[in-house]
Amino acid sequence: MKKILALLLAVFMVVGLFAGCGTDKPVETTAPKADDPVETKAPVADETEPPVVQDENVLPRNETLYFAGQQWGTVNSWNVIGTNQNNAMAIAGGASGYRSIMFETLYMYNPLDGGLYGLLANDDYAWNEDMTQMTLTIKDAAKWSDGTPVTAADVVRTWTIGVEIANGTGTTFGAYIDSIEADGQKVIINAAVNEAGQPVNPLKVLDFLTGAPIAQAAWIDTVAARCNNDATAILNDAGEDVVWSGPYTKYYADDQKVVLVRDDNYWGQDASMWGKLPVPKYIAHTIYADNPAGETALKAGEVDVCQQFIGNIQNLWLEDGLPISTYYEEAPYGVCLTMPTAWYNMNLPVLAENAALRKAIAMAVDYDTIIANAMTNQSPSFADVPRSLMNPTDGEQALYDHDAVADLQWAGNDIDGAIAMLEAAGIVDTDGDGWREWNGEKISLNAVCPNGWTNWQASMEVVAAAGEKIGVEITTLYPEYSIYQTVFTDPAQTEYAIFMWSPEAASPSNPWTRVNQFLGKDYVGVSNNWSGNWGQYVNEEADALIKQIPLTTDQDELIRLYTELTKIYLTEVPSFSLMYRPSVFHAVNESVWTNFPNDDNGIPPMDCTDGYGIKALYELELVNP
């Protein structure tokens, strides 16, 4: 139905779109000037200048795909081996794969089927028998923007510089990869091993394949030389002369917008890859002040792809009649891959020593209210997808025995059950003031999330209300994010009792990575902890089970391990998820472009940019060609 609306309304909207693109300030890029920083050119054999737009303030609407919700603030750099680039359109790693518009990974991850699809590499990666070494080959057709081949040596240099300067690649995968070697076009990845000679974690090596952008060795050496091999200088280099392998490159960027232009010499048009160029010539992202501004632009047809939460999004087509689509035509509208979670702070004895208190609070929370109000039903309920360690996807749901844990699960708003659990544990109100005590003192907790994160704040209000219903005082606290992020990542903090953060969504290493975030002790005591187990929960039995999973290949044994871990999680309740949620939101306006990812075409709704989701750029069609 939405597709029909898109086509019916397109004729009326498209004229307005051309006019709507012009505002008090130019919303599009001007062509590069002669004195702009020199960019690396496309292959010399067929070299052309980037196309010049006749109107300097307006890109051709029927050649431009507009985004919202990805780029916030001005781009800092184009340095793919650096840090703090704030370059979301060109240099960003997502939970479901790297954003490979300009810089490419060896493989692309598809969260819909869990598959790894070759990008720079052929579909031939293979482990040796004991999973200590992986081999793969680089595609013969793969080229850099300067026309030189992408080689195995580029992969090696990307790895070595990452380790040397401790950039994202080096720090993320350094514990799991010992070294990488090149043998012609063959890449040999040597896994890090433990004292027994076993690989530390083969699953994280798979994450490297889809999560580490490959940089050109020659360019890396150029940057290192001009920075005198100083790690800090290399990390902060602007990278204006960067060489790329992807289908788009930088065209224009300031504090108002970022524009990338298609490289018409892109190697991926070879038959061994896509066999054609992506459809849009330009990728543009206006830098909006906030989510409401981006939503307004989406409604007006000034944005094609919007990565923002939009409450009651169905009203945009049901009530407003706008040609706006989501991945699913019905709720939850998107593919829910992650679970925003309330974490208990185990540094507080009242929580660390009382599993009954932890579970009682979790049982009392009205999740249906959270899903209806905070998520406007853009999440399955916990009655539809009972809680576990898994996201709602079919692949993960098949990894544990549902019947074996059914008696431990809860759907929420079970006030009587929660009260009975507290009474049985001796956590009672002894002085008649309506609040329960522990060790002679009233239990007083807070429920915390960043100020301005409105759907999370709505969730914390429901948690606090649940506490009141069962006689446990819970007050809400909403610090500014700049404060919040320094506190919840401090392993010794005692300021926040119940606080929100999301575990990983989908990747080649999931659900293992998420389970480790929920129950593993690897992150306990880690300073500036952005990695997991933010509540500092320790369970030796769970940790031993977690460590077996990366080396387990038998499916039945995997199910047994994940089932045992789910039993521990639902019994101990070190945290509790409040909803299911997409890892990225994906709303599209079909007044100019159509044939976006949907549940019929096998392309994941990763905003046409992340992992295998980039395939969408090759399938788009103009509503009015």
PLM feature segments, named:
Residues 162-164, 169, 179-181, 251-261, ...:
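Extracellular/periplasmic solute-recognition and catalytic clefts
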Residues 93, 97, 111, 210-277, ...:
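Gly/Pro-rich hinge or "lid" segments in bacterial periplasmic/extracellular proteins
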Residues 171-227, 590:
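Surface-exposed binding/hinge segments that line
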Residues 123-168, 188, 294, 350-353, ...:
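Aromatic- and charge-enriched surface segment that lines or borders ligand/interaction sites
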Residues 67, 147, 298, 304-305, ...:
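Periplasmic binding protein-like
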Residues 68-129, 243:
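N-terminal lobe/hinge region of extracytoplasmic solute-binding protein
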